[in-house]
Amino acid sequence: MARRNGNNNFLNIMRSMLSFLDTRIESSDIDASNTPGGVFMNRLRSRLVDLISGRIGDGDDGREDDETRAPPPGRDLRGRGRKVRGSARQEVPSVEERNLVDRCNRMMNETEERPTRERRRTRAVSRGSERNGETERPRSEGVEDPVTLTTSIVVTGDGLGNTQAPSQSAEAQDETGPRSSRTVGSRGFRVVFPRIPSQELRFLFLTPQSEGSRGNIIYEIQINFDVFEASSEAPTTATKESLKKSSIVRAVEADKGCECAICMSNFIKNQRLRVLPCDHRFHVGCVDKWLLGHSNKCPVCRTAI
């Protein structure tokens, strides 16, 4: 019973999150296919649908197996029915899925609380204006909605990416400004989050879109939430002193099959690579720019240096 309830609770939360996103998309005047916020919500919604469908499919497979199994001699149908209901495969949510439930709940709860906070703030401003004999515009006007306006995602249509040279992407970004499009690697797609006009956080989906396993879906959803939640966090960048915790090595023959997760280009023999304490390695120029200008965490595993 506990296993079945655990699975049902997880599915209920995911369905609630799906309904929440549908409501936001329908009630918003943004273009869900072209605007940054619309793309973000649509992408998150599609992965939730995949996750829910996968869970239901697993349960159905288990029920079909039990229902097609012949009852043992001497066992009446009533007893068999109880056995079928009790033995249908129902999975306990994994640690990653429980974390996903918490994040979905937080997003929905914060959205429900926000109108109340805004109404209280508006009433307070209104009362202050009446006392001062002034008319002030409510502070909530013009405030960007963090769900619909703060995140943009660049997704390739077929998961293959474009063919522009990856090494050009970092320099091109500095020249053309933070809102210009980014080079998309051949293994997945890149998330661009413009927190402030002069800065942005870049997160990479490192698994191909063609792989539909539940682990990949959960990973992609978690990255979407990482991008969203970063909007309320002040950036913590590394210092030149903290970079000393890492080491610089030369790429060897064995590294030629690996790639830098930032620029998505393969390592070349004798290139200088920075190896972080978590053992992930990147081109020195790529990762130094990330650590000193954007975040003090590894772009892959989010471990602080």
Swiss-Prot record:
InterPro entries, A to Z: E3_ubiquitin-ligase_domain, Znf_RING, Znf_RING/FYVE/PHD
SUPFAM superfamilies: RING/U-box
Entries under Gene3D superfamilies matching the protein: Zinc/RING finger domain, C3HC4 (zinc finger)
Single Gene Ontology MF annotation: zinc ion binding
Sequence segments annotated as region (Disordered): 53-185
A Pfam family of this chain: zf-RING_2
Species per Swiss-Prot/TrEMBL record: Encephalitozoon cuniculi (strain GB-M1)
Phylogenetic classification of the source organism: Eukaryota, Fungi, Fungi incertae sedis, Microsporidia, Unikaryonidae
PANTHER family found in the cross-reference section: GB|AAD18119.1-RELATED, RING FINGER AND PROTEASE ASSOCIATED DOMAIN-CONTAINING
Composition skew (Basic and acidic residues), residue ranges: 95-116, 128-142
Domain of life: Eukaryota
UniProtKB keywords: Metal-binding, Zinc, Zinc-finger
Keyword Zinc-finger among record annotations: yes
Name recorded for this polypeptide: Uncharacterized RING finger protein ECU07_0330
Polar residues: bias regions: 161-171
Zinc finger annotations (RING-type) as residue ranges: 260-302
A GO biological-process term: ubiquitin-dependent protein catabolic process
